[in-house]
Amino acid sequence: MQERYSPTAVEAAAQQDWQARDAYRVTEHARNADGTEKPKFYACSMLPYPSGKLHMGHVRNYTINDMMARQLRMRGYNVLMPMGWDAFGMPAENAAIKSKVPPAKWTYDNIAYMKKQMQAMGLAIDWSREMCACDPEYYKWNQWLFLKMLEKGIAYRKTQVVNWDPVDQTVLANEQVIDGRGWRSGALVEKREIPGYYLRITDYADELLDQVRSGLPGWPERVRAMQENWIGKSEGVRFAFPHTIAGADGQLIQDGRLYVFTTRADTIMGVTFCAVAPEHPLATHAAATNPELASFIEQCKLGGTTEAEIATREKAGMRTGLTVTHPLTGAPVDVWVGNYVLMSYGDGAVMGVPAHDERDFAFAKKYQLPIRQVVAHEGKAYSTDAWQEWYGDKQGGRTVNSGKYDGLPYAEAVDAIAADLAAQGLGEKQTTWRLRDWGISRQRYWGTPIPIIHCADCGPVPVPEQDLPVVLPDDLIPDGSGNPLAKNEAFLSCSCPRCGKPARRETDTMDTFVDSSWYFMRYTSPGNDQAMVDARNDYWMPMDQYIGGIEHAVLHLLYARFWTRVMRDLGLLKFDEPFTKLLCQGMVLNHIYSRKNAQGGIEYFWPEEVENLYDAKGAITGARLKSDGSDVNYGGVGTMSKSKNNGVDPQALIDTLGADTARLFVMFASPPEQTLEWSDSGVEGANRFLRRLWSHCHAHRDAVARGLAAGADWAQAPAPVKDLRREVYGLLKQADYDYQRIQYNTVVSACMKMLNAIDDAKLPEGAHADAARAETLGVLLRVLYPVVPHVTWLLWRELGYTHSLGDLLDAPWPHVDEAALVADEIELMLQVNGKLRGAIRVAAKASKADIEQIAAAQEEVARFLEGRPPKRVIVVPGKLVNVVG
């Protein structure tokens, strides 16, 4: 055994051994030595995009997964921890444009490097199950399931107003628009009408909502709330404003009815205007003879189409000059075009009730429209001067200024008004959803080709199943001028499967969230080219633990739940929910330093380039450059980012201090679900701990060898030995509990306390001491192993534990010796007249009389009572004894 800890040598030796025996390959229905079947556990991290290098967020995510997998394997589980690559997407195209290489080469080069990094981390991954989204053998099943959804009517083609990213030149789903900008490019999103394919996720809205409300107890409440809000179930009334507006063909537009949906039918008597979306047929009709309105409508199309984007945009509108008829009063109602109305939501029109809707109130004030109160609250005076929160409160109010509906509370008013609208054939109660069907068409090259052929005679024709996969050419180099598939004749040209005439392939590719909606199930069925999943999927799924960032709460996680249900309904699965438990790990943060450059932009500096300035309390107040002493701004801590020069390269850390140091720090610095603030001193501390562990094992290797060879009668052990065993097993009990709670930072803390206890123990020489060192160090190595597998694995082997307990990967998890936790003696605080004067040790089973006698005989008692006899002795069991004199 080497005297000094060398992480490079240690980690190379461990990884070489694991690789040589394929230590992490798993099979279904694995059995114990006695023939009983092991329980399965499927733990999976969200697959990474192969951007080129791992970042510290990856290290944290995968170490959490790895700790879980290793510890459960020691506890007797058959554990699956797979890995794959979310390899399609726009970054590969953008990189290809810059470097003038095909996206395929860029992607596979990155995968090769990142895979080496993962292996250097020592992750317990079963690489025999590796998948890659850009592999035709994988995306063939995207295409196959799409065709099945097309057959069932779940997939369909339509033209709709969409979010268009002018930089990435593609359509974005609503979820991919953040504050009006594309989620990748950051460009302002535009509205365009484009044909594309959609998936009826709305058909599953009820089920998705019901399950997220009550059927996912293992998910964070925050994620469940985000999904519930996104699905957005609304119960209300859909009704029509009749009109006589005819189009150029002389026919009534939309059959003479302007439909709206409202959850506040009780306020219908307060309608003073209607607003329609810029794309609404009435808006188009009015704009045909109104150039100013036409210009306004074009301006409206420059924004995104999501509710989140609409909510933050300044509300603007323009009168169309058209009127519709109030269905209950017969009064004319002006029609406006509003930039806040979504054509894709409901009927693309809303009723305006300024008195009881804050948005309508602001709109009415801006354009000086009437405001008519129709709900009153007792003791509160309504004023149109400024909005007050109670104006929109439907609970506790009663209708006023509403004719025959006056005096009704909310629910009764809704029922009465809905009944009257239904009697006229103008409305009915209805449920609507915020959730929209999922548009999957993307005008990009690097994605799954949509398996459709366009024939001049037959129209869009599905590619026959036997012709799948439609293989994406992997040698094209995008130039930034649109989809290169549209210019690639070899890909485009084909024959119509129905009539045999020349035809053209669909050039749109699928949204990359299709790839990530089921990859975790492909891990369970590797190598099967005849089926999307097979019986092995029934063994592993649903997944026991999923690990990933909360930024995927609405996008990936919702789509995966939908995709699972589609596969279930096609008879491919026997379960509803893919993920039993979900852990969203926190971000990794680091300090941010910047200043304005000469061009007016912001220049960022690496933390190692600056020297911090502190106030009297030690808080950072600013910083200066080490190179020239000039001031820079300190921006606090933020998520590690290449653009802000505050990232830490995991590979550099692994190369210098080792993967175990990196793993130990990211697990110790913070609970897994909370943010982690990077600390160079914390990293150094983690490395010091490992060096100290190694030194201790080296110093006591002979004692451990003797202790392993001989047994021990612990009942006859001296007190220091019993104390050490009691402390270590107490810490093991806590670590067991923390492993179950996935509180890995306190597991590491327990390990550090164990080493302190073992290192500091003053054990008398002899067989008991040797046996205690061997036993307690064996406990420590096993508890610490899931965190730092390389160094613990080698120490386990070097110290001889393998001979009696087997290889550390499958060594039995240590059991708490409850007998060791029972103390022979206990320590009681000694007080004299209520003041602490020392401590006494008594037998754990000592009687009250024995304790009183021992306490009264202490020298401290005689000294502080100045020779007086005690008047009484108060014993607080297990804590203290107070001698009163």
Swiss-Prot record:
<feature type="short sequence motif" description="'HIGH' region">
    <location>
        <begin position="48"/>
        <end position="58"/>
    </location>
</feature>
<protein>
    <recommendedName>
        <fullName>Leucine--tRNA ligase</fullName>
        <ecNumber>6.1.1.4</ecNumber>
    </recommendedName>
</protein>
<dbReference type="GO" id="GO:0004823">
    <property type="term" value="F:leucine-tRNA ligase activity"/>
</dbReference>
<keyword id="KW-0963">Cytoplasm</keyword>
<keyword id="KW-0030">Aminoacyl-tRNA synthetase</keyword>
<keyword id="KW-0436">Ligase</keyword>
<dbReference type="InterPro" id="IPR001412">
    <property type="entry name" value="aa-tRNA-synth_I_CS"/>
</dbReference>
<dbReference type="Pfam" id="PF13603">
    <property type="entry name" value="tRNA-synt_1_2"/>
</dbReference>
<dbReference type="GO" id="GO:0006429">
    <property type="term" value="P:leucyl-tRNA aminoacylation"/>
</dbReference>
<feature type="short sequence motif" description="'KMSKS' region">
    <location>
        <begin position="639"/>
        <end position="643"/>
    </location>
</feature>
<dbReference type="Pfam" id="PF08264">
    <property type="entry name" value="Anticodon_1"/>
</dbReference>
<keyword id="KW-0067">ATP-binding</keyword>
<dbReference type="InterPro" id="IPR002302">
    <property type="entry name" value="Leu-tRNA-ligase"/>
</dbReference>
<keyword id="KW-0648">Protein biosynthesis</keyword>
<comment type="similarity">
    <text>Belongs to the class-I aminoacyl-tRNA synthetase family.</text>
</comment>
<feature type="binding site">
    <location>
        <position position="642"/>
    </location>
    <ligand>
        <name>ATP</name>
    </ligand>
</feature>
<dbReference type="Pfam" id="PF09334">
    <property type="entry name" value="tRNA-synt_1g"/>
</dbReference>
<dbReference type="InterPro" id="IPR014729">
    <property type="entry name" value="Rossmann-like_a/b/a_fold"/>
</dbReference>
<dbReference type="InterPro" id="IPR025709">
    <property type="entry name" value="Leu_tRNA-synth_edit"/>
</dbReference>
<keyword id="KW-0547">Nucleotide-binding</keyword>
<dbReference type="InterPro" id="IPR013155">
    <property type="entry name" value="M/V/L/I-tRNA-synth_anticd-bd"/>
</dbReference>
<dbReference type="Pfam" id="PF00133">
    <property type="entry name" value="tRNA-synt_1"/>
</dbReference>
<dbReference type="InterPro" id="IPR009008">
    <property type="entry name" value="Val/Leu/Ile-tRNA-synth_edit"/>
</dbReference>
<dbReference type="GO" id="GO:0002161">
    <property type="term" value="F:aminoacyl-tRNA deacylase activity"/>
</dbReference>
<dbReference type="GO" id="GO:0005829">
    <property type="term" value="C:cytosol"/>
</dbReference>
<dbReference type="InterPro" id="IPR002300">
    <property type="entry name" value="aa-tRNA-synth_Ia"/>
</dbReference>
<dbReference type="InterPro" id="IPR009080">
    <property type="entry name" value="tRNAsynth_Ia_anticodon-bd"/>
</dbReference>
<dbReference type="GO" id="GO:0005524">
    <property type="term" value="F:ATP binding"/>
</dbReference>
<dbReference type="InterPro" id="IPR015413">
    <property type="entry name" value="Methionyl/Leucyl_tRNA_Synth"/>
</dbReference>
